[in-house]
Amino acid sequence: MTFYISSSLTPTHFSKPLNPSNTLFPSQFRGSLSSFVRRRKPTEAKLSSKFNLFPSRRNGLITCCSTSSFESTESSVSQEEDAESNRLFEKLRETERERLSNMEELERKANVQLERQLVMASDWSRTLLTMRGKLKGTEWDPETSHRINFSDFMKLLDSNSVQYMEYSNYGQTISVILPYYKDGEPLGEEEDSKKEIIFRRHIVDRMPIDGWNDVWKKLHQQIVNVEVFNVDVVPAEVYTTVATFVVWSMRLALFVSLYVWIDSITRPIYAKLIPCDLGTPTKKIRQPLKRQALGSLGKSRAKFISAEEKTGVTFDDFAGQEYIKRELQEIVRILKNDEEFQNKGIYCPKGVLLHGPPGTGKTLLAKAIAGEAGLPFFAANGTDFVEMFVGVAASRVKDLFASSRSYAPSIIFIDEIDAIGSKRGGPDIGGGGAEREQGLLQILTEMDGFKVTTSQVLVIGATNRLDILDPALLRKGRFDKIIRVGLPSKDGRLAILKVHARNKFFRSEDEKEELLQEVAENTEDFTGAELQNVLNEAGILTARKDLDYIGREELLEALKRQKGTFETGQEDSTEVPEELKLRLAYREAAVAVLACYLPDQYRPISETDINSIRSQPNMRYSETSGRVFARKSDYVNSIIRACAPRVVEEEMFGIENLCWISAKSTLEASQRAEFLILQTGMTAFGKAYYRNQRDLVPNLVPKLEALRDEYMRFAVEKCSSILQEYQSALEEITDVLLEKGEIKADEIWNIYNTAPRIPQKPVRPVDEYGALIYAGRWGIHGVSLPGRVTFSPGNIGFATFGAPRPMETQIISDDTWKLVDEIWDKKVEEIKAEAVIQIEEEKKKPQILMATHFF
């Protein structure tokens, strides 16, 4: 083995690698090294000393001694030199081995990098050629052809006819690429080189789940060469160099520059075409999360409650309407195949619909069923089904019913079902309305469709709007029972209060019973939720006052808070100017006088003040229990009372000095008159019900205005007459308000009963038929002169005398009638005078006597 030594002993200076078979080991090298040392010259010694080959003797000198001493010295030196040389060459051998392994690793990585670059270049070239259509019909870009069965694919594998395969969707879909002649004939056993060959892709249809095992067994028998690249390991093994970094940086810079240039050109164009699409981009989620989100759109969002779970709510928590509890408990027993109903041919209803005002306990009943039925329970909301994507509502409904049938017998509860069960063909038919209707149709199909299912699933729906639900959803066979959960009665309210008063502290049971009885009497038309809130508010007030028990004062205060009429008296007072204070005093005094003259038995007055500046009167009323059954006189009296602020301000300050504090009084009076005419059916306008003026045909609008003006005329005149009659009471109440700032109901009644009265002329009553007759006539001549009777289209019986245009109307006032009478009388007098003149002229003319006169 020949090797060269340079100025320093490093592995990189060997021109040829060491060969272990030709290397001199210490046992073979010992003798030659000793003789070499003995025979070397001083120059060689200097050379060896320079290169540190023999460090143990580099400072020593070779001297001549006696034979015995020289031999012993030579023997010891030879042993030291042999040991040192062994260490030296062992170090050289390890260093050379490390260098060779590093070179082999570098060469392997370079080959891997080159191979990856070649593969990438071939892939890019193949992709570009495919995009340009150069590889159309080859094995890289085959033509799409018909599907083949899995059995045919296995026959191809058995005959070793499969050369190319593709798989996608994680191996769930496989395709086989087969060669064909261009004229469409398949290749035979002997290939014709003159004909052109094309490749076609055939997707394998209906592949079994475990079909890959058979496919791989067949393919492994035909594999000739397999090349596997671990895409996660190979890039990590390739060393990044400066050149690679520079090249990829240039590529990235070129790509970014190209993107910015294209964006700068196209953005103004898109800004003009689609200006709404260029907003701030939203944060994008990762692709797997996107796929997961899109895949979960069709899944049901209903909350599942197993048979063993408890909701914390039982039927004991629902009080007031015991018959509803009995109905639902009986339905649950039928659903669970109770022995009482098994042999009687009774089937469980498919659906139960709970409807009623908000807060009456519909959702509470569903929670109680979920807690006590002992059956799987699915709770959903009507808004959970509809999304912005088409088909999501139907898919979620289908998934909900499929899940419930897998747990049958089970219960589905859909709260606010009107969100998806509204009538079809409404104003929201486009867009989201069509998607909602698809969900509704799926519910109809699942509840009672063509497909018959034996799984017992009970659907419970809850809604506040039964009137807007689709009739197909309400028919028997879908919702077999429709139960109204209405407002509780007095006994029901007492039972509800007892349920919610379990954890409340009262002084004694007798006092508790008495207070709850009083609250139940004063809370007519209260729902269960409102009663619960009353007791909770009373508990808050008790804690605020640092009391141990709930008392009557706290309950009444909580009741006022619930009704929205509670005032603490600690509100900030506003500075009221003297002139405005006088106006407020007259306004409140007028309202008080009218309330005493025309009392409202359902709203007795309580007190009033002038401490707050509002457009509405400050009069406060006492609430009475019971329902209000208003008569026509009550409506008319309310119209008169509403006119009091405007009338008193006009009489006291003049029509030129009106201000905003009485602005809403005439508006309120006009609205009440319109309500009386349109919605009560108590007037000559007719018994038909109209929600507002927009429901009227054009011919009836003038009649409504005429009748409303007639009621407003009567209300203003009557209110003015009452205030003039009780002028002294009005002034006295005003003085009390200016002095004290407030006045109670007892003092108001005392002043009203003791004040002197000034009699007034009776007010002309309301003439409903006269107002309707005058309304709609056309012009003076049409009224005064006789003519033909014509009927307005769409309004049978509406007659106008000589009216050429019945659609146009004009109201004739009393002054106009007086003017018509004057014109008529004047015209008659003129005609009479002309007749008298003509007669006198006739008398003055000479008479011609005929001959016959003498005979």
Curated annotation (Swiss-Prot):
The chain crosses the membrane at residues 242-262. Residues 1-78 form a transit peptide. GO terms for molecular function: ATP binding; ATP hydrolysis activity; ATP-dependent peptidase activity; chloroplast protein-transporting ATPase activity; metalloendopeptidase activity. ATP binds at G356, P357, P358, G359, T360, G361, K362, T363. The keyword Glycosyltransferase does not apply. Belongs to the AAA ATPase family. This is Probable inactive ATP-dependent zinc metalloprotease FTSHI 4, chloroplastic. It comes from Arabidopsis thaliana.
